[in-house]
Design a protein with these regions (language model features):
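Catalytic cores of RNA-modifying enzymes
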Residues: 1-209, 238, 249, 258-261
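C-terminal lobe and adjacent flexible extensions of AdoMet/dcAdoMet transferase-like proteins
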Residues: 190, 207-264
Length: 264
């Protein structure tokens, strides 16, 4: 009997149990013509279930031992890439056609991976959706609405580019070894932003700046960013039609877009 792979703490590995891998494949709803990229296949619980149902499956795994273990039983339509997904050329892959994303993300790098996917979508397109397993608290931040404690930079920047829906919630026992937290599977359906932005980088910079002071009034939270661009925060807020006594966490994406345009 082949030994089960050992999860490595330094990679934040928690391997999905077979019954939950079946549920995740059902939630993904793969089609025979689909091309997929899987982030962190681990020992292949999802890989080996998904591959027979799709045209191509590219996997990116940082752990060389897991890649070696998968090589012996991966189907011919699976491409195994040893490396860090944060360094992977996703734009090169989508040149051949759309690529759906799936992955059980390590908790310690889930946010950088989310921002990489957003950046790749912005630059190259070709990513219809991403079905991602995340720590439940991270999922809650992405789903959060204006005025709630979880609403912030991650909520705004992810939902600027994608519709978000929750597919599954998983207990710690869905993984081996069991983490100390619950997990959730979100589906991100990538699309153009629902607002018009002349300078998206300035928008992102403003959002990050004002949310470092999310409990201050907008008049004060906006001031450092506005002054750095030669603009008065009170004038910009008035021009955008936003009450300067509100707090950053109460603004929706449309209000933030208007404000960014006035400052820029």
């Amino acid at each position: 009997m082949k030994a089960r792979p050992r999860a490595r703490k330094r990679y934040g590995q928690h391997f999905l149990e077979p019954a939950w891998a079946d549920k995740l494949v059902a939630a993904v709803d793969p089609r025979p013509t689909d091309r997929f990229l899987e982030i962190g296949p681990g020992p292949g619980a999802l890989t080996l279930r998904l591959a027979p149902r799709v045209a191509q499956l590219v996997t990116v795994e940082i752990d060389a031992e897991l890649i070696a273990a998968l090589e012996s039983n991966a189907p011919s339509n699976v491409v195994l890439v040893h490396g860090d997904f944060l360094d992977f050329d996703l734009a090169g892959l989508v040149r051949a056609g759309p690529v759906r994303i799936v992955g059980n993300l390590p908790y310690n790098v889930s946010t950088p991976i989310l921002f990489k996917l957003i950046g790749d979508h912005r630059r190259a397109g070709g990513i219809p959706d991403a079905i991602l397993m995340l720590q439940r608290e991270v999922a809650a931040r992405i789903e959060a609405s204006p005025g709630t404690k979880d609403y912030g930079v991650l909520s705004i920047l992810v939902r600027l580019h994608a519709g978000v829906s929750r597919l599954l919630t998983l207990p710690p026992g869905a993984f081996r070894p069991a983490p100390k937290v619950h997990s959730a599977v979100l589906r991100l359906d990538f699309r153009p932003p629902p607002v018009s932005l002349r300078d998206e980088e300035a928008f992102e910079e403003m959002v990050r700046s004002i949310f470092t002071q999310r409990r201050k009034t907008l008049l004060n939270a906006l001031r450092p960013f506005a002054e750095a661009r030669g603009t008065d925060s009170r004038r910009a807020l008035a021009a955008a039609g936003i009450d300067p006594t509100r707090r950053p966490e109460t603004l929706d994406v449309h209000e933030l877009a208007r404000l960014a345009e006035e400052v820029a």
